[in-house]
Amino acid sequence: MELILGSQSSARANLLKEHGIKFEQKALYFDEESLKTTDPREFVYLACKGKLEKAKKLLTNHCVIVVADSVVSVDNRMQRKAKNKQEALEFLKRQNGNEIEVLTCSALISPVLEWLDLSVFRARLKAFDSSEIEKYLESGLWQESAGCVRLEDFHRPYIKSSSKNLSVGLGLNVEGLLGALKLGAKLSLL
């Protein structure tokens, strides 16, 4: 059965590759600006549900579609993708030396199964090096990530402690997804 990743995220694609999951990547457009909530948990859930509804239109008998959405929460204040360098700097200042939460809602739909999961990755951060912040902002890498959080590079050396579910922090609950894929395979045999 073909797996489609309904996301343009390179981090999500890399997670699937690292776990040996073959997939095709397709962009699904969902207007997140239409969501009026500022509650991080509600927002990420509704965004993922919206993407899941779009995915249903692509669903055939021979495919599984995976979608996800992530936001960052600092003191219960939501951080999405920064619109510009100034907003990126504000996000990083709020994160500096604090605990951050990456909330990821992952979902899968197949002809036999619909699975949705909302998980949280928590990390306590050390203070950022101001010269490294400047380099990071100049690199433009922050533009790809909710809250400008890149656990795979910029944020990694600043993590004092964290929860163990790193894939959630990177944008997809791979462990949960693997379980859903196994269950879906069993159900399709019935």
Curated annotation (Swiss-Prot):
Family matches, as InterPro entries: ITPase-like_fam (IPR029001), Maf-like (IPR003697)
Residues at the catalytic site: D69 (proton acceptor)
Keyword Thylakoid in annotation: no
Catalysed reaction, written as an equation: a ribonucleoside 5'-triphosphate + H2O = a ribonucleoside 5'-phosphate + diphosphate + H(+); a 2'-deoxyribonucleoside 5'-triphosphate + H2O = a 2'-deoxyribonucleoside 5'-phosphate + diphosphate + H(+)
Pfam families documented for this protein: Maf (PF02545)
Names of the cofactor(s): a divalent metal cation
Keyword Protein biosynthesis: no
Entries under HAMAP family matching the protein: Maf (MF_00528)
Protein name in the entry: Nucleoside triphosphate pyrophosphatase
Species for this entry: Helicobacter pylori (strain G27)
